[in-house]
């Protein structure tokens, strides 16, 4: 009997028989995953089934690149559906506006930082792995900078190992929004 299928994503493994760790998500992140799941099930899945049917109608499947591409896409879509369903089942949805962490940096908090060397100021919100988007100021809970910030409060200095060496950031403000 072949081994059960395994899907990984966001640092977690999903397979039959495994007990999954809780996956922290902000409310926005959970909604984004639900929206993606809905789109995959109601739009993408049907589109790829149609593409497979059209490719089959072309005849010989042994040398049919469109058929192979559609089957590959179908495999990706089905795998992503399983992955998202697993993440949502294991999700712990956290509403940052309801946090009261006493001014400490925790998952979901928004942190204003000042790089000590340059004086540059940045603002990040610490979110789940699937939500991270540096361009929008959303950093993953598992990123080096988030790990350095967790548990600290305004006035503390966090040292982050960056590719160019260690960078020090002073925490200017911590908000739960």
Predicted regions and their residues:
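Hydrophobic aliphatic residues
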Residues: 85-88, 149
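Helix-rich terminal scaffold detector
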Residues: 5-82, 177
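Elongated periplasmic alpha-helical coiled-coil
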Residues: 56, 90-93
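Preference for short coil/turn "hinge" residues that link or interrupt alpha-helices
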Residues: 18, 33, 54, 86-87, ...
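Non-DNA-binding regulatory cores of transcription-related proteins
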Residues: 94-177
């Amino acid at each position: 009997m072949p081994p059960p299928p395994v899907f990984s994503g966001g640092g977690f493994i999903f397979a039959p028989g495994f007990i999954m760790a809780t996956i922290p998500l902000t409310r926005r992140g959970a909604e984004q995953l639900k929206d993606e799941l809905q789109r995959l099930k109601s739009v993408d899945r049907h589109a790829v089934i149609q593409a497979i049917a059209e490719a089959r109608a072309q005849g010989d499947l042994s040398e049919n690149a469109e058929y192979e591409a559609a089957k590959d896409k179908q495999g990706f879509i089905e795998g992503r559906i399983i992955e998202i369903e697993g993440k949502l089942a294991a999700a712990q949805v956290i509403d940052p506006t309801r946090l009261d962490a006493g001014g400490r940096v925790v998952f979901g908090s928004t942190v204003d930082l000042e790089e000590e060397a340059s004086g540059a100021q940045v603002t990040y919100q610490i979110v789940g792995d699937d939500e991270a988007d540096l361009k929008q100021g959303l950093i993953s809970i598992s990123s080096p900078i988030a790990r350095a910030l967790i548990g600290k409060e305004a006035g503390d200095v966090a040292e982050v190992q960056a590719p160019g060496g260690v960078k020090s950031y002073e925490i200017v403000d911590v908000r739960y929004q």
